[in-house]
A protein has these predicted regions:
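Solvent-exposed loop/turn and edge beta-strand elements of beta-rich ligand-binding domains
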Residues: 1-249
Length: 249
């Protein structure tokens, strides 16, 4: 592959896709993203690429955007953008919010393709094994053609990556009688980046288990009773249990 040409593919024959998205962590903890547009070589009228950072507290490096135009071809079983031209100055990257952008590419002629590169950075210390999620989409006018989801795993240098293998069990009890209470709804939020893990409801035994957690600190709030915040620090892989007491009605 000539110096400066970007390639995508591997041992299996590459498929023709309207849009792909991949991400890679760099040693400085930034994430480099690559979006390929129109490997399928179609004509796409009024084309637009949108992008959303699904993981909270990740920011775009706004001066890192590069846009290349050329023709996607398969060489040595890989996609390569041939005859590429840097057309960054011809397009405006617009940011409706800090967690999304879009680029209006206009009409893409048959056989034309684009490669969009940019960086993003976390605004907090990532945990080893943590996954950062990002979604790119290709549109033609108001019609979405395809989504591409990039899930990029952060691995700490020299460290292990246990990942999302932790869980915690909540047990809601009546403060007076000690009996288990069903139907209590708890919202679990990760303290490090403010990501809402989800809302969880206790079953007939008054218990609910929250799975797939990182080893980290979380805030647990009962949302259907105006309950107080509870802090939970996940320290070990075994299921931990918090007993939560409530005054009877």
């Amino acid at each position: 592959v000539p110096i400066g040409e970007v390639e995508f593919g591997g041992l299996t024959p590459p498929s023709q896709k309207d849009l792909t998205k991949v991400g890679n962590f760099k040693p400085d903890n930034t994430i480099t993203y690559d979006i390929t547009v129109n490997q399928s070589g179609k004509e796409v009228p009024d084309a637009k690429v949108t992008d959303i950072l699904k993981t909270p507290n990740i920011s775009y490096v706004k001066d890192s955007f590069e846009i290349y135009k050329g023709k996607w071809v398969i060489a040595d079983n890989r996609w390569v953008l041939k005859n590429k031209e840097n057309v960054t100055s011809q397009f405006k990257v617009e940011f409706p919010s800090e967690s999304e952008f879009f680029i209006k590419l206009g009409k893409i002629n048959k056989g034309e393709g684009y490669h969009i590169k940019y960086k993003a950075k976390p605004n907090y210390k990532l945990q080893s094994g943590e996954v950062v999620e990002n979604v790119a989409s290709l549109w033609s006018s108001q019609t979405k053609i395809i989504d591409s989801i990039a899930k990029t795993t952060y691995l700490e240098a020299g460290g292990s990556a246990e990942g999302y293998v932790y869980s915690i069990t909540l047990h809601k009890k009546d403060e007076t009688s000690g009996s288990s209470l069903a139907g209590a709804v708890f919202r679990v939020t990760r303290d490090r980046n403010g990501a809402v893990v989800g809302d969880f409801t206790t079953d007939s035994t008054g218990k609910v288990t929250i799975p797939n957690l990182l080893k980290d600190k979380y805030t647990i709030k009962e949302i259907n009773e105006g309950g107080r915040d509870l802090l939970a620090e996940i320290e070990r892989q075994a299921v931990e249990q918090l007993d939560i007491k409530s005054k009877g009605n």
